[in-house]
């Protein structure tokens, strides 16, 4: 796996699924392929994206700045600086300085990532802030190692919390989760159906599913009533795709 592929993988792992994730993936691919060279416009676009947490925006801004060639005097962006200040905690800053000194001795991506993984997310963000604010310099490879270590920690905690939700025995949470999944699957079906003539059927199924979820939420239903909702939807989607000659197993 190439270095940039690895960076893209880690960075995208902390971006919530949805149309915005696909957009960010495209931007990252363009940047890494040298197709997008307007850092100013890229940062302006990133700043105004909804849904993303300030830290995720900060990490993406840091990656764009590392990758896109820019004039030396280009202003640093406040939204990135604020996200990478380790919540203003002096302990984070102290640890970030110690980590920075260690990173100065590293020359490889994997070496830097290993060193960084033993620090807290706050210290890692502060260390990125040091480099972003030009208070310290490391090679691009080492900076990417720092980025990936930070993303790995964030993705780990997201995964833990996701697993807790999936394995919860609380029927109300499970019920709501099934309805949310059915709703997002319906949305994906509508997007995939696009404008082809045969799409009307898939759109109809998706629309009915969304109306059903809306009705269930409005009148309040028994927690077990949503069981199988998402799977029914997926079976419909796959039947539609078979007729279209498309095989897609990705939603399972």
Curated annotation (Swiss-Prot):
Q: Identify the stretch(es) annotated as Membrane-binding.
A: 1-164
Instruction: Report residue spans for region: RNP-binding.
Output: 165-252
Mention any one GO cellular component term assigned to this protein in its UniProt record.
virion membrane
Intracellular or extracellular location(s): Virion membrane; Host nucleus
As for membrane topology, the entry says:
Peripheral membrane protein
InterPro entries for this protein: Flu_matrix_M1, Flu_matrix_M1_C, Flu_matrix_M1_N, Flu_matrix_M1_N_sub1, Flu_matrix_M1_N_sub2, INFV_M1
Misc note: Most abundant protein in virion. When expressed alone can form virus-like particles in transfected cells.
| Protein task | Plays critical roles in virus replication, from virus entry and uncoating to assembly and budding of the virus particle. M1 binding to ribonucleocapsids (RNPs) in nucleus seems to inhibit viral transcription. Interaction of viral NEP with M1-RNP is thought to promote nuclear export of the complex, which is targeted to the virion assembly site at the apical plasma membrane in polarized epithelial cells. Interactions with NA and HA may bring M1, a non-raft-associated protein, into lipid rafts. Forms a continuous shell on the inner side of the lipid bilayer in virion, where it binds the RNP.
Quaternary data: Homodimer and homomultimer. Interacts with NEP. Binds ribonucleocapsid by both interacting with genomic RNA and NP protein. May interact with HA and NA. Cannot bind NP without genomic RNA.
**What family is it from?**
Belongs to the influenza viruses Matrix protein M1 family.
The record, for HAMAP family, names:
INFV_M1
| Name recorded for this polypeptide | Matrix protein 1
- Species in which this protein is naturally found: Influenza A virus (strain A/Equine/New Market/1/1977 H7N7)
The record's gene field reads M
């Amino acid at each position: 796996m190439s270095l940039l592929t690895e960076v893209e993988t880690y960075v995208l792992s902390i971006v919530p699924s949805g149309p915005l994730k696909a957009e960010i993936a495209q931007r990252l691919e363009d940047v890494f392929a040298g197709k997008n060279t307007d850092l100013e416009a890229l940062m302006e676009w990133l700043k105004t994206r909804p849904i993303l947490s300030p830290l995720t925006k900060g990490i993406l801004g840091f990656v764009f700045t590392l990758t896109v060639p820019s004039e030396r005097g280009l202003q640093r962006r406040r939204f990135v600086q604020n996200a990478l200040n380790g919540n203003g905690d002096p302990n984070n800053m102290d640890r970030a300085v110690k980590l920075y000194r260690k990173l100065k001795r590293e020359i490889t991506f994997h070496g830097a990532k290993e060193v960084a993984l033993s620090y807290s997310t706050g210290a890692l963000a502060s260390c990125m802030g040091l480099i972003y604010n030009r208070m310290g310099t490391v090679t691009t490879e080492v900076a990417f190692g720092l980025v990936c270590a930070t993303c790995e920690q964030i993705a780990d905690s997201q995964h833990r919390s996701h697993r807790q939700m999936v394995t919860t025995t609380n029927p109300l949470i499970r019920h709501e989760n099934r309805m949310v999944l059915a709703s997002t699957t319906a949305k994906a079906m509508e997007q995939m159906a696009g404008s082809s003539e045969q799409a009307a059927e898939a759109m109809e199924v998706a629309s009915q599913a969304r109306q059903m979820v809306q009705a269930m939420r409005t009148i309040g239903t028994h927690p077990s009533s949503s069981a199988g909702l998402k799977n029914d939807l997926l079976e419909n989607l796959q039947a539609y795709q078979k007729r279209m000659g498309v095989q897609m197993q990705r939603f399972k």
